Amino acid sequence: MYSGICICVFLAVLSASSFGQQTAGSHNGNPLAAELEQSLTEHHRHVRAPSSAGPLKPVPRLDGSIDQRANIGALLAKYLQQARKGPTGRISVMGNRVQSIDPTHRINDRDYMGWMDFGRRSAEEYEYSS
C-alpha cells in the first residue's frame, strides 16, 4: 500500500516536471511552434473577452446581510445552549448502556463504546484444549 502511494507520487512529480520542461523549452528555435502557440493564446483571449452587446448591468443585491447576521446569531445562541446542557442523543444513550453491564461479566474490561473484538470473544466462549 505504501509503495503504491510512493509510486503514484513519483509519477505525479515526474509528469509535472516533464510538462514544465515541455512548455518552457517547446520553441527551441522553431519559429512555427512559437507562432502556433502565440496564435492559440490570442484565440483564447478572444474567446474569453466579454461580448460587445453593451455594458454589463450590476445585479441588484438584496440587503440580506442584517437577516443573515441575525440568523447566525440565533444559531450560535442555540448551539451554546445545547453545549451547556451536556451530551444528548445517541452518545448519552450508549453511555447508560455501558454503565448497566453486569460487573461479573467475563470481559467487562474490554466493553466500551465502538469496539468489537470478534476473535477474542469467540475464542473465550469455547475452551480449547491444546
From Swiss-Prot:
It comes from Struthio camelus. Keywords: Amidation, Cleavage on pair of basic residues, Hormone, Secreted, Signal, Sulfation. InterPro entries: CCK-like (IPR015499), Gastrin/CCK (IPR001651), Gastrin/cholecystokinin_CS (IPR013152). It is found in: Secreted. Residues 1-20 form the signal peptide. PANTHER family: CHOLECYSTOKININ. Disulfide bonds: none annotated. One of its GO terms (cellular component) is extracellular space. The lineage of its organism: Eukaryota, Metazoa, Chordata, Craniata, Vertebrata. Residues 21-48, 122-130 form a propeptide. The modification Phenylalanine amide is found at residue 118. The modification Sulfotyrosine is found at residues 112, 126, 128. GO terms for molecular function: hormone activity; neuropeptide hormone activity. Belongs to the gastrin/cholecystokinin family. Pfam families: Gastrin. Highly concentrated in the duodenum. Also localized in more distal parts of the small intestine. Residues 40-59 are annotated as: Disordered. This is Cholecystokinin. GO terms for biological process: axonogenesis; digestion; neuron migration. The precursor is cleaved by proteases to produce a number of active cholecystokinins. The gene is CCK. This peptide hormone induces gall bladder contraction and the release of pancreatic enzymes in the gut. Its function in the brain is not clear. The keyword Cytoplasm does not apply.
